[in-house]
C-alpha cells in the first residue's frame, strides 16, 4: 500500500490491486467507502467461489477501481476469457515512479494492452488528478472498454448535483431492497419506482436500498456531492467516458454486503449497460487501438469551498477540479 499527501488531502493506493485507491482523506473526513471486513474471505486467499462475479465481490472492500479492459459481465473476446469488470483491478502493477504527492503505475492485461495510471495531488489544494493511457503492443487492432469505479461514503440524506439527461434502470433484479423499476427509463433526477410513483435520485435515501442505473449520453462530465459539511466533486474526460453508471448499495442483505455497506458510486464509463466488452464490440461501443497506438483519458476528484447547503447552485466542475 502506497501513500500520497500534499498536506491538504491524502490518498492510499494499492499497487497490488491495479492501483485501487483505498482512501481519500481530508482531515478526519474519509470520502470513499472503506470496509475493513474480515469476511467474506477473498478468493485470492482461499479458493474460487465458482463465479467471476462472486470472486470479484469477495475481494471488494469499497474504494476506487479502474475497470479495464472489460467492464461488466465476464465474456470472451478474441478467444481470451475476460473476467467480470476486467482483470486490471485485480492485477499486481509495476511502480514506475513514486514521489510524495505523485505516483505512476502500469500493468499489462490478458489482451496485448498496457495501461499506465498517474495519480497526482495538486500542491496545496484538495485536488486529485488521475491521468491514464492505454497502448497496443500488438500488430493487430485490439478492442477495449474502460471505466472508473469510485464508491463514495455519502451519508444518508446527502444531495447529488448532476446535469440533466436520460436514465435507464438496469433490467436485472438487484435484491429485495431494490426500489427502482427494472428496465424503466427517466430523466435525471427522477425514475419510476415499483408501485407507480417516482424516485428522486438526487438525494441519498434514508432507507436501505439497492439501485443500478445508467445515465447514458451525458451532456457534461461532472458531478457534485454533499458529504457532511463538505462538497466533493468528480469530473472526467467525456470523450473517454460518455456515460455514467449510478450504483447505490445501502444496507443490502446479499453477498458480500450482509447489511454492512453504504455506497453511492458515480462511475464514468465508456459503455452502457454493463454487458461487457464482447457486447460492446457487437454494439459498436468498444474502442479500438491500432498497432502501437495510445489513447489517454483523465479524471479529477476535488473538494469545494462551496457550502453544503448551496450544492445545487453548482453549474459545473472543470478538469482542474474547480467548481463553477
Regions found by a protein language model. Name each.
Residues 1-129, 140-145, 150-324:
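Surface-exposed acidic/polar loop and edge beta-strand patches at domain peripheries
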Amino acid at each position: 500500500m502506497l501513500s500520497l499527501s500534499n498536506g491538504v488531502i491524502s490518498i492510499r493506493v494499492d499497487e497490488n490491486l491495479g492501483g485501487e485507491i483505498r482512501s481519500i482523506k481530508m482531515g478526519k473526513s474519509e470520502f470513499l467507502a472503506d470496509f475493513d471486513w474480515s469476511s467474506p474471505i477473498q478468493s485470492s486467499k482461499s479458493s474460487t467461489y465458482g463465479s467471476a462475479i462472486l470472486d470479484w465481490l469477495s475481494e471488494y472492500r469499497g474504494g476506487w477501481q479502474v475497470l479495464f479492459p472489460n467492464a461488466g459481465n465476464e465474456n470472451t473476446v478474441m478467444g481470451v476469457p475476460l473476467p467480470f469488470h476486467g482483470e486490471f483491478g485485480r492485477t499486481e502493477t509495476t511502480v514506475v515512479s513514486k514521489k510524495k504527492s505523485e505516483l505512476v503505475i502500469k500493468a499489462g492485461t490478458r489482451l496485448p494492452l498496457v495501461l499506465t495510471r498517474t495519480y497526482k495531488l495538486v500542491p496545496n489544494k484538495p485536488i486529485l488528478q488521475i491521468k491514464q493511457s492505454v497502448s497496443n503492443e500488438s500488430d493487430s487492432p485490439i478492442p477495449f472498454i474502460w471505466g472508473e469505479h469510485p464508491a463514495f461514503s455519502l451519508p444518508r440524506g446527502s444531495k447529488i448535483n448532476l446535469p440533466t439527461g436520460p436514465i435507464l434502470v438496469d433490467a436485472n433484479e438487484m435484491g429485495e431492497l431494490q426500489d427502482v423499476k427494472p428496465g424503466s427509463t427517466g430523466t435525471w433526477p427522477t425514475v419510476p419506482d415499483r408501485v407507480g410513483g417516482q424516485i428522486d435520485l438526487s438525494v441519498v435515501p434514508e432507507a436501505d436500498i439497492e439501485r443500478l442505473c445508467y445515465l447514458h449520453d451525458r451532456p457534461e462530465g461532472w458531478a457534485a456531492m454533499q458529504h457532511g459539511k463538505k462538497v466533493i466533486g468528480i469530473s472526467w474526460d467525456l470523450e473517454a467516458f460518455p456515460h455514467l453508471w449510478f450504483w447505490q448499495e445501502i444496507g443490502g442483505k446479499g453477498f458480500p454486503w450482509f447489511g454492512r455497506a453504504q455506497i453511492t458510486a458515480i462511475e464514468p464509463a465508456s459503455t452502457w449497460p454493463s454487458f461487457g466488452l464482447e457486447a460492446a464490440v457487437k454494439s459498436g461501443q468498444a474502442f479500438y487501438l491500432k498497432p502501437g497506438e495510445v489513447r489517454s483519458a483523465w479524471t479529477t476528484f476535488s473538494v469545494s469551498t462551496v457550502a453544503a447547503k448551496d450544492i445545487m447552485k453548482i453549474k459545473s466542475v472543470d478538469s482542474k477540479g474547480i467548481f463553477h
